[in-house]
């Protein structure tokens, strides 16, 4: 505020104005808490006496110190006066506020406060200025405590929510890692309620027969539907379907027994092939498979049917997918190239040394295979006869059960049926069908009768397994133009008769010389 300059010491304390505000601020802050008493004039006198009793060497320093102390005391007095003035002003202001509206000071000075959760009743009684200050302090402290309390409540609730959310997250994670299926499914509820008449799309993997039977029922029964979560449902449905199949089979067997026996005897036909070496048995079976479908499961035929022997499996014979009387649907799961019910059955294989039984699915295939009787295959003469139970028992040396007696058929019935269709067809001129002996011309037989086709060939069909095919010498085509009344000389007949006479004479009058015998032995003329 102002400076004091000393005449004796100009360099010690030149300016005190810079220190005055600091002292005033310090005194002001202290005066707000507690007012200080004013210094007594006796203290000043003591300082003066102390200064007067000092020696001459320290006189200058004492004068300067006393001057500074006096200046500080004076400034403190000024600060105390200003504090008193402020207190008086505050008191008058508080009195004026109480006189105007009887409201506390915090109403005129609103602040952003946090609204507590509970309503607090505030007292508005008339008090003095000191009580107002205490009330303000108490209200501020109360508001602070309420804010802290509400904040703690919010923090606790937030923590509880976070803990519950964390627990829910943990539970959800634990439930996701749980692989155990639910104990009750929608299928179980539907089984309990038994409502609805249309099954869901997920249950359409039931067999075709079973789904076809469900259309005849009025309501949908979920007990007969496979359940993914119920292993016993498949066994139960299999038993139901098996019982249904058995009932249908018994009914069909009693009603169609005659029809089944006739169809069985007319569909399967078996033959016996013999006379071949064992080294060409696979080639022989493959050769006879070209005439028709062989029912026996030979390994050599699997690759030809598109079946790998390493992964070959025989499927069950019972039908769980289709109705037995329904011929438009597959009877069961079949392999490639097997589309009927008879192919699923395991047929017995009868074979031995240089003989084998082959069963065809049609009589026409068996008749075609019988034509291979007496032919040469891979350098071996083979025979082919129709199947009979007695023949196989003699070849195999064992007794055949009636269940395994499959493939016996009546050849004459098919021969008579095929004779009517082939009777109008002329036989080849160089083929003669005989009953076991070669048909030869007699010398007394006229040439005209020999050229007549009706006298040469019989009306028996050419593919009969009981007949033998023989080839004649080939002179018949040249003799067909000679009639019974023809005067044309038969040169061929005369030449042939002369050659035969000369040959007979030569054999009867053959010379017995050593040279002739040696030449015949060397050149082989004796074999001619």
Swiss-Prot record:
Superkingdom as given in the UniProt entry: Eukaryota
Location of Phosphoserine modifications: 458, 464
Alphabetized GO MF terms: phospholipid binding; single-stranded DNA binding; structural constituent of nuclear pore
Biased composition (Basic residues): 110-125
Chain segments carrying region Disordered: 23-64, 88-144
Bilayer topology: Peripheral membrane protein
FG repeats: 2-3, 61-62, 195-196, 274-275, 291-292, 523-524
Annotated keywords: Cell cycle, Cell division, Coiled coil, Membrane, Mitosis, mRNA transport, Nuclear pore complex, Nucleus, Phosphoprotein, Protein transport, Repeat, Translocation, Transport
Listed InterPro entries: Nucleotide-bd_a/b_plait_sf (IPR012677), RBD_domain_sf (IPR035979), RRM_NUP35_dom (IPR007846)
Main location: nucleus
Comp. bias (Polar residues): 51-64, 97-108
Chain segments annotated as coiled-coil in the UniProt record: 490-510
Post-translational modification: Phosphorylated by CDC28.
Remaining remarks: Present with 2740 molecules/cell in log phase SD medium.
Entry domain remark: Contains FG repeats. FG repeats are interaction sites for karyopherins (importins, exportins) and form probably an affinity gradient, guiding the transport proteins unidirectionally with their cargo through the NPC. FG repeat regions are highly flexible and lack ordered secondary structure. The overall conservation of FG repeats regarding exact sequence, spacing, and repeat unit length is limited. FG repeat types and their physico-chemical environment change across the NPC from the nucleoplasmic to the cytoplasmic side. The RRM Nup35-type domain might be involved in the control of mitosis.
Official protein name in the record: Nucleoporin ASM4
Source organism of this protein record: Saccharomyces cerevisiae (strain ATCC 204508 / S288c) (Baker's yeast)
Source organism phylogeny: Eukaryota, Fungi, Dikarya, Ascomycota, Saccharomycotina
